[in-house]
Amino acid sequence: MSLATKERILDAAEGLFANHGFAATSLRQITAVAEVNLAAVNYHFGSKEALLTAVFERRVVPVNQERLRLLDGLEAEAAQGKAIQLEDVVRAFLLPAFNAVEGFGQQGAKFMQLVGRMHSETNEQLRAAFLKLFQPVGQRFVPVL
């Protein structure tokens, strides 16, 4: 299976999960939009839950990496005696997300819609998996505030 196949599955899932929610989206719908068979989804992701996690990881991991890079820079400046300003910490947290959503194009809007849906999902396991992606970043940012 090609990387393009995996990306088509992720794009299809992201859009459908954003529009209909996790529970209301079937793997059959995802395979139809992605133009792949069910075996391809199972091969790449194993389950619908793992697919949702991959959708989030694809967008959140690079954003979090950039957040931490910016925070590292602020902490390095602080080690040299420069005071860390609250504005700089907030910018280090928010700017990577804004830049990423803008860079994702139309898929960025879908992803933000999906993030909003995740906050109203009733499946606690999914909510916990989603929030777990942000926990390491939160643990680094909170002490600096």
Kindly give the residue locations of the regions a language model identified.
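Short alpha-helical scaffolding segments that buttress acidic/His motifs in well-ordered protein cores
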Residues: F93, A97, M112-H119
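Short alpha-helical functional segments enriched in proximate histidine and acidic residues
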Residues: L16, P62, A100, V144
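Helix-turn-helix
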Residues: R8, L16, H20-A50, A54-V55
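Hydrophobic alpha-helical connector segments
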Residues: R69-G108
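Amphipathic alpha-helical packing segments from all-alpha helical-bundle domains
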Residues: D88, K110, N123-L145
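Amphipathic C-terminal alpha-helical segment
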Residues: N99-G103, R117-A128
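An amphipathic alpha-helix adjacent to DNA-recognition modules
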Residues: L3-D11, F45-D72, L131
